[in-house]
């Protein structure tokens, strides 16, 4: 017999549905994601730390879950909100149903609610704090109180919470349909040594760097610039991650040192915002952010439109860009800044996710540009 669940927003709106995950209470910022596929990649993306994810596509769970599709070692989203959970997961790769997957990691989830209504509320009022309660004791008053108590993501440094505790090497390339996940590559196949800061890095980013010949040393978020320079890298990568970039002063200061030393730097998502802050720009909290795999972005240099994967609630403010930063990409949804490039240093960044997972690969050539900068710097 299905257990009940409820979602309460901080404005007092209540949604009643059925539990599809673990029993318990979960609090976070409620956001909506418009991706039709890739729910497992979304749930395991560390960028969703302290967020409750609403998926707007009505049927979620059709393909079950598989360990090969995880973007990190565990689910980082605080909870999941969907319209309908299919009774059958049809996929030859599936290892576990979505419901069992949520329960195995003690994640709450709610289904059978009007996700279109919820999305309209978030779109019109902005991202709200919320609380999911699942199980036998559904206390609306308690849920509302907990939603109102949640401090919100502005000013919250989450990168140091989700980062790796110790540095490690990564040499595994991308998954293929024919071979699955490959064995680690030999150093002879990886001519470029790149230090990757883990602010909440997705595995597919690391794999796409390896595909292009990068031998990765992945380091904790608070690793000093001096420790990184001692590794003698050919380039530095700044990963995606959750929370507000402004409190990440350790990363901002380290990035300033890399820029002063002329090292090639490539940032994605939070890493993009870190590069902007290190270069003198400012960041802002967005009304409801960008979350989905169908976002059109204009490449200003090539005058073409890309369809991209997005997941961010903060953005670099184009109005604050200093003279040494030029805009390279803008969102065609709201005109917000999507990409920057230093005019005086081999450093650039992109707000979206060129590694996709899930999503299109239109922006994947950005990885190639990073390799070009490394080659030019090494010449």
Curated annotation (Swiss-Prot):
GO biological process entries: 'de novo' pyrimidine nucleobase biosynthetic process; 'de novo' UMP biosynthetic process; glutamine metabolic process; L-arginine biosynthetic process
Pathway(s) the chain acts in: Amino-acid biosynthesis; L-arginine biosynthesis; carbamoyl phosphate from bicarbonate: step 1/1; Pyrimidine metabolism; UMP biosynthesis via de novo pathway; (S)-dihydroorotate from bicarbonate: step 1/3
Ranges for region CPSase: 1-189
Top-rank EC class of the record's enzyme: ligase
GO MF annotation terms: ATP binding; carbamoyl-phosphate synthase (glutamine-hydrolyzing) activity; glutaminase activity
Top-level taxon of origin: Bacteria
Binding-site residues for L-glutamine, renumbered to this chain: 47, 241, 243, 270, 273, 311, 313-314
UniProt-listed Enzyme Commission number(s): 6.3.5.5
Glutamine amidotransferase type-1 domain mapped to chain residues: 193-379
PROSITE patterns assigned: GATASE_TYPE_1
Self-association and partners: Composed of two chains; the small (or glutamine) chain promotes the hydrolysis of glutamine to ammonia, which is used by the large (or ammonia) chain to synthesize carbamoyl phosphate. Tetramer of heterodimers (alpha,beta)4.
Family, as annotated: Belongs to the CarA family.
Classification via HAMAP family: CPSase_S_chain (MF_01209)
Function of the protein: Small subunit of the glutamine-dependent carbamoyl phosphate synthetase (CPSase). CPSase catalyzes the formation of carbamoyl phosphate from the ammonia moiety of glutamine, carbonate, and phosphate donated by ATP, constituting the first step of 2 biosynthetic pathways, one leading to arginine and/or urea and the other to pyrimidine nucleotides. The small subunit (glutamine amidotransferase) binds and cleaves glutamine to supply the large subunit with the substrate ammonia.
Descriptive protein name: Carbamoyl phosphate synthase small chain
Organism (species): Vibrio vulnificus (strain CMCP6)
Gene that encodes the chain: carA
